[in-house]
Amino acid sequence: MRSHTLTSLVLLAHAMVTSGQQEAIPRSIKDVRVLSPDWICAVVDPTEEILAARQAQFGLDLAEDKKSFEDDQAAGKSNWYYAFSKTYRTLVEQKAYHQPLFAKFNETEFWKVNGASPADVTVWAHALDSLPGMDAGDIPTCDTSNFFRTADMVYLKLPGSLKDGESVEVKGADGRAGSLTFQDESTPCWSIKVNQSAYASDAKKKAAYLGMWLPGIGALDFKAFEGKSFYLKKFEKGARWDKGTAVGEPVFTGQIKLRKKFTDQDVKREGGSNLTGEDVYEMDFSAFQGEGTYCIQIPGLGRSWPFQVTKDGYGSAFYTMMKGLYIQRCGTELKKPFTAWERPACHTDTKQGQFIPETNNWYTTKYRQGAENQASVGFRDASGQRIGLSQFTLIGNSSPDSPAMPGVSGGWHDAADFDRRIYHYGVIWDLLAAAEAFPANFNDGQLNIPESGNGIPDILDEAAWGVDVWKKTQRSDGAVSSWIEQESHPGSSANSLAKSFLENQMQMFAATPDRTGSFAYAQAASWLGRLLAPYSPERSKEYIESARRAYAWAKDEDHAMKGREFPIVNAMRDPKLKGTTIRFDEDPKLTEQDPGYVAAAFAAANLYFATKDGSYLQDWEASGMGKTYSHIAHGISPSMCMPLLLNEGLPPEDVETMKKSLIEAADKLVGSQDGYAYRMLWLAPDEGWFHAMGWGNVYSKARTLAVAYAVTKDPKYKTAMENAADFFLGCNPTGTTTITGIGSVYPVVLQHIHSMSDGIPDP
């Protein structure tokens, strides 16, 4: 049976399932959660039901299609139909089975709570990931992104308020059931939001929050708790992540206070919105200075997720995030005792590619225009018209017979794939800035990485891993590449990490070196070399000398990329370019709008600090960066400024200009933070820019505060950073941490091929 027959049979087949085979479809409630004395949430995962219904209707057809697929594969033929067959049939079943089910969930008559109908009900489909494949040998979860898997969050208003010790049984009309027993000391309340990792014992502000928004309902009403007591109690861990209890007498008692009504959180910018939809209450325990593992406990609501209060505060989160960098390492074996997520070395073979690096957004933006729209630089077609194209078009035209680059491996894999690129220098700037500003916080052996024990602080070893991949690309003339990429994003059509990650790897190619990438390398290598001097003088000299050579090559305007021509043979992403020859030119003059201008100036400053060679100071002064910084600061990582503000030697007026600009930005963030109910670190609510919060931008604001604190030691910046960390670690509307592996509730589904392919639910 082929797909054109499906539509006519859907209703008949579905009637057969719902009448004659209903008992074969599994139905359950995965969890019942407390939100308030009056509201609970029944969590339904309909995945098994949808797949069972799909099998009942289309099992024979899918088996036939799969056999045809396997036969064609064995015969060396292409067969695209099987994937479309599964996609179509699954989507049909999601609509035919799940949509009516979802509608039923939204009816009070469908549910019974302790035998009575709930007072109200509302449902939210919470996206989880994708539906699994047909069987263990089939296409894995990461290749079924068309099949959205959801959890139906069924919010039920109880007929009467919960009492301590009361059991609640939830039943659906189709037989699904779940239950809980509410206990003040041990039942988690999902409306209490805390930093689920650790608060610093000396933090000026330590707070938890209370609030919840429900679809179709709005802000849950916690007014009855305003002015009531909350208790900070020792926490005793249970057998599971969601088990445990508050024990003993309170170590701190405080009052629940209203922080912001939802009506005070409307913003008019960007179409208008409400920031949380919640009436947010605050529980301040800043005066508590003890250490240990605790939870917030509120009579009538339950307890929060556990957290620690420790002297080092955010040290545990720092360790976990740094371990994430280690796990992202490319070109090396990952093994115990450094990680439980083991794998052999990967991507150890790199060849010289014939493609332009992405150092100036060449592939996506129109750069400068010449007369009559004839582009003076960038990519141009045969007529001279400026064009944009996919980077994979040029990378795919790199020859597999290109020269090998022995030993070129390393760096960190990008977010979901395996490239290493110039943007990764941002990580290096952050690591070096932290090590420069707060050296007492970092030592050898604290991160449990292979380099631990070599006498060098681990944070510098990790930074060196990011620098070394580019150092290995350095040519004899000093030029350095800044991008290593494959001809396309890696596939994930295998069902295991070994196959998708290690077997049949596409060839890695390194981009043509350019001036901007070489300047960026010179900045990083000279900075790293200087910080390594107390621990390894020889390595220090090696990095600094390598930086000198890269800088000297990049400074020569004759090394600008000019007159490059690229015959396009493979052009799957840009079919109109196939068979043509495109041209590329780079302007040798660097202006304020060029990333190379910034990279050159900061490289000169760092080389001056590392060598005390006055020629680099002259280059810094000639760049005019001290005067232009405030105009282009929005495009410069504040971390890059750390050495310039903490080391002597630059013109005082330049340093003062940069310092003033950064302090003004930091003060603005401190001022706007208190305008948010959960003390999020962002621009002021009336400024908007909420659309730009994706891709980690909301995290990056903390860099400004870190530099301001390092330079001034004003505790207000430290407090603002701690508030921001609390937000990321669970003090937010969703009540989840934003970092895998930290806290009780954290992301497990993310765009990360390793995790999607290794068969382990926890990333």
What positions do the PLM features span?
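Carboxylate/His-rich catalytic cores and anion/metal-binding grooves
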Residues: 457-483
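Surface-exposed, short loops/turns at beta-strand junctions within beta-sandwich domains
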Residues: 157-165, 286-291
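Aromatic (Trp/Tyr) and acidic
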Residues: 25-152, 197-198, 204-299, 328-425, ...
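Acidic, Ser/Thr/Gly/Pro-rich low-complexity segments and short DxT(G/T)-type signature motifs
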Residues: 160-191
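Solenoid-like repeat scaffolds
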Residues: 624-630
